[in-house]
From Swiss-Prot:
Signal peptide limits: 1-20
UniProt membrane topology term: Single-pass membrane protein
Species assigned in the record: Homo sapiens (Human)
UniProt region (Disordered), positions on chain: 62-130
Parts of the chain that traverse the membrane: 31-51
Primary location recorded for the protein, binned into one broad class: membrane
Any GO CC annotation of this UniProt entry: membrane
Pfam families, per database record: MAP17
Keywords: Membrane, Signal, Transmembrane, Transmembrane helix
Protein name: Small integral membrane protein 24
Encoding gene (name): SMIM24
């Protein structure tokens, strides 16, 4: 309460002389007022972004710690498995590229494969009659 009372006393002491002053008015040009408004707005945005970065930095650091724990490799894992997995992935990639290339060229045997795998309706009918 003492600080509030002290602020009120200072306000009354400082405001009365300010109102009594009679100086010539010095107005800023309109473009300078606009420039000051834009600079003030950008400064406020900068402060808000800075506060946001500081506020959210702790949560981000905790997330990074969790990911490092998850990313630690198993020391007892067999390295040959990794090599095998890489080789299989490479083979799949080559196979996929080859399929893309044949699809572009129009040399696909997908229709023949389907006919060989699934017997037609007339073949099913023949097998059921016999």
């Amino acid at each position: 309460m003492e600080t509030l009372g002290a602020l009120l006393v200072l306000e009354f002491l400082l405001l009365s002389p300010v109102e009594a002053q009679q100086a010539t008015e010095h107005r800023l040009k309109p473009w300078l007022v606009g420039l000051a408004a834009v600079v003030g707005f950008l400064f406020i945005v900068y402060l808000v972004l800075l506060a946001n970065r500081l506020w959210c930095s702790k949560a981000r650091a905790e997330d990074e710690e969790e990911t490092t724990f998850r990313m630690e490799s198993n020391l007892y894992q067999d390295q040959s498995e990794d090599k095998r997995e890489k080789k299989e992935a490479k083979e799949k990639e080559e196979k996929r590229k080859k399929e893309k290339k044949t699809a572009k060229e129009g040399e696909s045997n997908l229709g023949l494969d389907l006919e060989e795998k699934e017997p037609g309706d007339h073949e099913r009918a023949k097998s059921t009659v016999m």
